From Swiss-Prot:
Highest taxon above the source species: Bacteria
Protein name (record): Glyoxylate/hydroxypyruvate reductase A
GO cellular component annotations of the record: cytoplasm
GO molecular function: glyoxylate reductase (NADPH) activity; hydroxypyruvate reductase (NADH) activity; hydroxypyruvate reductase (NADPH) activity; NAD binding
Family indicated by similarity: Belongs to the D-isomer specific 2-hydroxyacid dehydrogenase family. GhrA subfamily.
Reaction catalyzed: glycolate + NADP(+) = glyoxylate + NADPH + H(+); (R)-glycerate + NAD(+) = 3-hydroxypyruvate + NADH + H(+); (R)-glycerate + NADP(+) = 3-hydroxypyruvate + NADPH + H(+)
Family annotation (Pfam families): 2-Hacid_dh_C
Keyword Cytoplasm: yes
Key word Electron transport present: no
InterPro entries: D-isomer_DH_CS, D-isomer_DH_NAD-bd, GhrA_Enterobacterales, NAD(P)-bd_dom_sf
Organism: Photorhabdus laumondii subsp. laumondii (strain DSM 15139 / CIP 105565 / TT01) (Photorhabdus luminescens subsp. laumondii)
PANTHER family listed in its UniProt record: 2-HACID_DH_C DOMAIN-CONTAINING PROTEIN, D-ISOMER SPECIFIC 2-HYDROXYACID DEHYDROGENASE NAD-BINDING DOMAIN-CONTAINING PROTEIN
Cited function: Catalyzes the NADPH-dependent reduction of glyoxylate and hydroxypyruvate into glycolate and glycerate, respectively.
E.C. no: 1.1.1.79, 1.1.1.81
Length: 313
């Protein structure tokens, strides 16, 4: 069995050694330009066009992350990059779920206990105790009910929060009020004090975090974006803060990364910036997931994380 590996930043030697330990009967090599030799599987992130185009014999392509928008954009720009009929698989969790849970809980608690405002007071050398929020009014809304969205919602329930969730199609999550479809988006927003975005990046979801949406939230709400930067209309967030629709935002993803040095988000007193760290790929867990999927495919069983290319996730 032959596997080709490509990632512009990861340590290829670490991944090659790790995969060989998990699947002793494979041959895995780092793909380099001009390598047109046979491969059964490809493990990739942002691969060059010629790595996959016109390659026959592939049984599966594994994306080394949870998002697939980058490779789908490549396919859109240069049709034929992805071999027809070959399953494209993403990492549904691979340790990212726990990281997302930690980040979301940390930021929700940050706002519940009004730590953002105490930080502002500290800069003013001002000693004033603020009235705590009533939890029954501090409703958390999760946009997106995929694997990561469900895990975040369930964790917040365990922390005692009232949680609601919105998704494109109906989803049921224990102790979470579920909404779905465009018709129910307004009702979902109107009851949310904290909005956590975990939607996939698709043409339909890009720009969804805009002034119109912010105006439908509970007054003086909070935004936590841990999905993709393309979801947020950045200027609209600044306007929403000026208008009082949003009083605090935690942003981990941006339209341009790294965030430009002169970007207004860096110095805005009501915006917290983190450098795309809410959930990162953990090599050992990712390799366990990919190895198990290869075993399943070789046995004729269904694999996990298969992407619906038409839907974009």
């Amino acid at each position: 069995m032959e596997i080709i590996f490509y990632h512009p930043f990861f340590d290829a030697a670490q991944w090659i050694q790790g995969m060989q330990q998990r699947l002793p009967n494979i041959n895995i090599r780092q793909w380099k330009r001009g390598d047109n030799k046979h491969a059964d599987y490809a493990m990739v992130w942002a691969p060059p066009y010629e790595m996959l185009a016109n390659r026959s014999g592939l049984k599966g392509i594994f994306i080394l992350g949870a998002g697939v928008e980058a490779i789908l954009k490549q396919e859109q720009q240069k049709p034929g990059m992805l071999p027809a009929g070959v399953p494209l698989m993403r990492l549904e969790d691979a340790g990212m779920g726990l990281q997302m849970q930690e980040y979301a809980v940390a930021m929700v608690l940050h706002y519940l206990r009004r730590m953002d405002e105490y930080k502002l007071q500290q800069g003013q050398r001002r000693w004033k105790q603020l009235e705590p929020y009533d939890r029954k009014d501090f409703v958390v809304g999760v946009l997106g009910a995929g694997v990561l969205g469900r895990r975040v919602a369930q964790t917040l329930v365990e922390w005692g929060f009232i949680v609601r969730c919105w998704s494109r199609t109906p989803k049921q999550i224990n102790n979470v009020v579920s909404f779905h479809g465009e018709d129910q988006l307004g009702d979902f927003l109107s009851g949310s004090k904290v909005l956590i975005n975990l939607l996939p990046d698709t043409p339909k979801t890009r720009g969804i975090l805009n002034l119109s949406l912010f105006s439908q939230l509970k007054p003086k709400s909070y935004l936590i974006n841990i999905a993709r930067g393309a979801h947020l209309v950045e200027h609209d967030l600044l306007v929403a803060i000026d208008k009082g629709y949003i009083v605090g935002a935690s942003l981990d993803v941006f339209v341009e990364e790294p965030l430009p040095e002169m970007h207004p988000f860096w110095t805005h007193p009501r915006i917290t910036v983190t450098p795309h760290v809410a959930a990162i790929t953990i090599p050992d867990i990712a390799m366990d997931t990919i190895s198990e999927n290869i075993r399943r495919i070789e046995k004729g069983e269904l694999s996990t994380g298969v992407v619906d290319i038409k839907l974009g996730y």
